[in-house]
């Protein structure tokens, strides 16, 4: 009645584990040109441009950016901060993102498009919904980076720069 052995035992020798593919990322040397193209883009919603710049400055995951809510931000203080709730984080722990003055400036600009409540980066046509998962990727592709860069790849770019600087411990960088 009960199975004595494991019928799948030994299958790991037959099937190989798929290799994980890293996200395409721009070399840091190309980032200034990319940002210039973002700034010069035409026919793109201003909120999309601001979201791209904010994502580059904070190097958060796309989902964290898309679902960012105004109540998570404290920007009117000496040390502006974004506190991302654990339920939205990959590791399930609350995450604190210090904000540069440039990031704060982007948030201040975004208020004219999204208002002071709800999603910081909402859909243009339906502000009660977050920005589409593909908005920033399509924007990057439109700038001529299709296949060369993924939005998640910016995290790789920043991680490489920070690790090569040797100013921070690799474990601390990985936590960001």
Give the residues covered by each predicted segment.
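Short, basic (Lys/Arg/His-rich) helix/loop patches that form interaction surfaces
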Residues: 36-48, 58, 97, 111-125, ...
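Alpha-helical DNA-recognition elements
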Residues: 71
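Helix-turn-helix-type domain boundary/helix-start signal
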Residues: 24-25, 97, 129
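Short, flexible loop/turn elements at secondary-structure junctions
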Residues: 15, 56-58, 88, 103, ...
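Flexible loop/turn segments at secondary-structure boundaries
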Residues: 61-63, 91-92, 106, 128-129, ...
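Basic, Lys/Arg- and aromatic-enriched nucleic-acid-binding interface segment
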Residues: 3-68, 78, 90-93, 113-115, ...
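Bacterial peptidoglycan biogenesis and beta-lactam-recognition machinery
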Residues: 1-3, 168
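Basic, alpha-helical nucleic-acid-contacting "clamp/cap" segments
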Residues: 33-37, 74-126, 139
């Amino acid at each position: 009645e009960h199975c004595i052995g494991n019928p799948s035992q030994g299958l790991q020798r037959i099937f190989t584990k798929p290799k994980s593919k890293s996200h395409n990322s721009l070399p840091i040397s190309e980032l200034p040109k990319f940002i210039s193209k973002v700034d010069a883009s035409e026919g793109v919603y201003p909120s999309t441009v601001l979201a791209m710049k904010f994502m580059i400055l904070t190097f958060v995951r796309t989902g964290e950016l898309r679902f960012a809510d105004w109540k998570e931000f404290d920007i009117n203080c000496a040390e502006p901060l974004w506190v991302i709730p654990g339920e939205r984080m990959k590791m399930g722990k609350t995450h604190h993102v210090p904000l540069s003055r440039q990031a704060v400036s982007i948030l201040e600009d975004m208020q004219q498009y999204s208002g002071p409540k709800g999603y910081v980066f909402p859909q243009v046509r339906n502000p009660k919904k977050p920005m589409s998962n593909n908005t920033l990727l399509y924007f990057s592709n439109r700038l001529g980076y299709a296949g060369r860069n993924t939005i998640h790849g910016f995290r790789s770019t920043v991680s490489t720069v920070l690790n090569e600087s040797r100013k921070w411990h690799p474990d601390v960088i990985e936590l960001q």
